[in-house]
Each structure stands twice: as structure tokens, then as C-alpha cells.
Amino acid sequence: VPQQNKNITIRLFTDDGTVVPCEEKYTTGMQLQKELDVESDALDDNYTPYQIEFPLDAGCHKKISIVCTIEDAYEKDAFATAATEMARFDALEKKAGYHDELAETLTIAADHFLAYRQSTGLMTVLAGLPWFTDWGRDTMIALTGLTLATGRYQDARDILTTFARYVHHGMVPNMFPDEGTAPLYNTADASMWYFYAVGKYLEYTGTPEDYAFVQETIYPKLKEIIAAYEHGTDFSIYMEEDGLIHAGSGLDQVTWMDVRVGDWVATPRHGKPVEINALWYNALCVTAELAEPVSYTHLTLPTT
């Protein structure tokens, strides 16, 4: 890190022992197995500026607090940080409302995929750090399990709101790249999975406030997506005369089978992919239901 990011300040705290500077601070050319497994850059340098030395007599038990951080706001006591995090986990389990060990374990596991995105000021889903950030398809598929089944309805609203803001040419982003660059839209199914996520959101919540949120924030975007898919948008996505959606052409890979190596398309699926059209049918059903007086007649959504 210090070799590439000279301005980063690394802070190290310990409540015991002696901090001893290392003579050799870098171990270069280390191969990282996880990166190698995902065909990422697998070589890195290990920075070890200090060693912490403390006496430990035979039969002695000790708890040592060590904190290493690059954050501006930090807690020097690792035990206090751990206690705060455990209290947060307890609150998440209580909110989910399960009284089953496996379900509680999954509730906490789901939390690891959710993060606060500074650029939007809202929560988001990270598909797989450090390699993958926000992916539209993955987010919409996982939204039910990560947020709705765990009672995190506000986080679900945040996620739906974020992707609604970035609808472009009637398309939900495929992914938000690192470093804050513009979203990529090369997918036909992320927009369709968005309808599925919206439907599940209302299925789990269903209060007047939630219907009002969908009416004001989400429904206009759903209509925009439907119109774009019907009349045609980017990446050769359009509705044909039989009512089915055509997607993709040339080197474009717009389904989940999106492997491309140079000019070689591993799994070309141009035409009318079956799952895209199943999701298209679902999208039409969700939109039709929202256009009718479902549950709350005073919240009937306009169809024009």
C-alpha cells in the first residue's frame, strides 16, 4: 500500500508489548492464492513496518488489543470495537426475528454483502470484494435474501433507489466499476430482475408508506424500462412482433453467460434468450399489478 498510495497514513495501536521497527519492511513478489483462483493479479508486496514483542510466561493467558487502520475515525481499543460489532449483530438478529441458529448465522452472513456507498449516501450490495463491487443482476437477485428476509427494509429501499437513479436509456446498470467511474449497462437481464426485486419488496412490506415510495420513486422508472424494451434501446434490445424481447448482437454479451475473450464470444446468445423473456413476462405482470388498485385504492398508480 505505501508504495502505491504515498499519502495514506497507517495507524497502529496496541495495549501491550513493545513496538519494534523492522529492518526489512517489504516482502516482494508474494503470490496470493485467492487472486490466482479468480485469475486476478496474484502478485503483491507485503508491508511489515513493525513487530510487537511482549513477554509470555509458561501457562500465562493474555488478551492483546492490536488495531491497524487507515481510517480517519478510529477506536484504539480492539475489544471495544469487537463489543460494538457484537451488539450490532445482536440487533440484526433481533430485527430478522428468527429463533433458529442457522437462520441467525445466515442473517449475519448477509450483512457482509451490504455496505454504505459514499457516492450515493445509501446502502448497496457488493457482489464480491475485492474483485467485484455493485452488480445490477447480482444485487436484484440477492436483494430478497439479503434485506427483505432479514427485515432490513430501509436498506432494500436504499438499493432500489440507487439503481432507479442510474436508469439510462431504460436500462439498469450492469455494474458500478471501481474508482467512481460511470456505470456500465451491457446487460439485458439486470433491468428485468429489478422488477422482480420491486415485486418482492412490496410482498414483504406492503404498507401504505411502501406503496407510496414505489409510486413516487420506482414506478416511473418501471414504465421507462418497459417503454425502452418495447421500442428499442442499447445493445440491440427490443421487442419483436411476437411480443418477445430480442437482445444482443455482434460481440455484445448481455446475459449472465457473458464470457468474452478478445473478439471470441464463448457463449453467444443473441436472439430471444429464454430467461430474459420469462423475466420480461414477470416485469409486465408486476407493472400491471402496480397500475391497478392493489391493496390500497387511494394509491392507484397512473398508467399514462
Please place each PLM-identified region on the residue numbering:
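Active-site-adjacent structural elements in folded domains
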Residues: P49, L122-W131, F176-T181, D263-V274
